[in-house]
Amino acid sequence: MIKEYYGAETFILNKDFAYILVIGTTDVSLIPGLTIAGATPELTHFTPAADAEYVLLGKCKSINTIPVSPTGIPTPALLTRASLSFINPLKIVVNAGSRILPKIPYIDLQGEPGKDIRKQALSMEKVNNIIENSIKLGEELSNEYELIMIGESIPAGTTTAMATLLALGYDAMDKVSSASPDNPKELKRKVVEEALRNLPTDSLQRLAKVSDPVLLGVAGTSLGFKGKILLAGGTQMTAAAAIINEFDKNKLKDITIGTTKWIVEDKFADMLSLAKQVGVKVLASMLDLSISAYEGIRAYEKGYVKEGVGAGGSAIMALVRGVSNNTLVRKIDELYGELVGSNNLHI
């Protein structure tokens, strides 16, 4: 089942599409207690590369296991790979600025890893590189596809998303989600408030100060693409949509955010109000993982992880094409079981 918000419609998704995964890092993820998108703050810089490797290969090369939370909850890349296995679209990894580079083929936007937003996230040179090169990528994809789905992997991305939304004038304080069931709102607020001090007046310079490479890469690819776009992600994609809207007021009519029920039902965030403010449509997968054989998968139903790597959008694409909830969960369990059996995961 898929829920539709703000005029979103699923029929536009019934065509061939390419899956684009934009990866990057931000030094904000090194702040202790801010994100659980990695077993330790230091390992969060390996998460995007490992996510990309797993989606393409079914195994990781940059680290010897798939990314997990400190309590062992697996990356949403598992859900993405399971969903896409029923469709087998073209998959493209785009490096917007990852500290660790994936050991697979990828497109490089000539960006840089995001630094601490309390000081300066990105140089203007790299911001321009990311936007210009991703626009070109979107234009090229338009030659082959009428629909693309864009996912993201960047630990601490909800914090940079909140800073970005606020910098662009939206009411976003405390409204973004977290990979943890215990959203560290006070810490996020403190980091973001410090980042927003002495903001420049120019929009692009504001983004260079407080944003991250992934948001810019997602926005640029969308700006360059001529067809329909499913932004596969949670509250981060509302920030990407806000950037898109900053540069092209007509673009959002072709864009829908595709996410999970765990995001839209998150009591500690308000993704739908953010989407409404920005003016972007939303679809949410009602995928139910409570029937999984594995505790690590069932943990998603308790508010862990929630979204990432295009998990919600990928599930929507599978469900739209007739894959049942039970079939999809069986596939997720099968892939998870392979990882457990090969000692590539400890539960």
From Swiss-Prot:
MF terms (GO), sorted A to Z: nicotinate-nucleotide-dimethylbenzimidazole phosphoribosyltransferase activity
InterPro entries: Nict_dMeBzImd_PRibTrfase, Nict_dMeBzImd_PRibTrfase_arc, Nict_dMeBzImd_PRibTrfase_sf
Pfam families named in the record: DBI_PRT (PF02277)
Stated family: Belongs to the UPF0284 family.
Protein name listed in UniProt: UPF0284 protein LS215_0030
